[in-house]
């Protein structure tokens, strides 16, 4: 599994979690049973880190929204932002530029065009604030 595929799996798990209060293990188990996408240990580790740090991640997101609240962000864009910000702030092995680039690719794949610009803008603001 490539790093991009691992990131995409973590994004899909993060998106799924936005619809339930299930635990990380329950969400991963159901996703593996459905076999809609590949999930490896690295993807689960990334997803678990996102879930464990979600409040901090969401605080960072909210801080960088202009005239928005986090509740207005689409669930897809929010999942992309959570993955990227987790990697930017909590993973030393991933550079911010790579996290942002990968987030934009995920946004291009899964969101509307306007959301791609929104995601990129929020992440650029987070990156500048370090």
Give the ranges of each region predicted by the language model.
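N-terminal interaction/assembly modules
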Residues: 1-130
């Amino acid at each position: 599994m490539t790093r991009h595929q691992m990131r995409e799996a973590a994004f899909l798990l993060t998106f799924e979690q936005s619809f339930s209060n299930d635990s990380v293990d329950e969400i991963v188990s159901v996703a593996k049973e459905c076999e809609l996408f590949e999930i490896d240990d690295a993807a689960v580790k990334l997803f678990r880190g996102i879930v464990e740090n979600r409040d901090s991640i969401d605080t960072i997101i909210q801080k960088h929204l202009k005239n928005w609240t986090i509740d207005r962000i689409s669930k897809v864009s929010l999942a992309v932002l959570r993955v990227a910000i987790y990697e930017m702030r909590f993973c030393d092995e991933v550079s911010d530029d790579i996290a942002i680039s990968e987030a934009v690719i995920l946004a291009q794949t899964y969101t509307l065009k306007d959301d791609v610009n929104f995601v990129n803008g929020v992440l650029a603001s987070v990156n500048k604030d370090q």
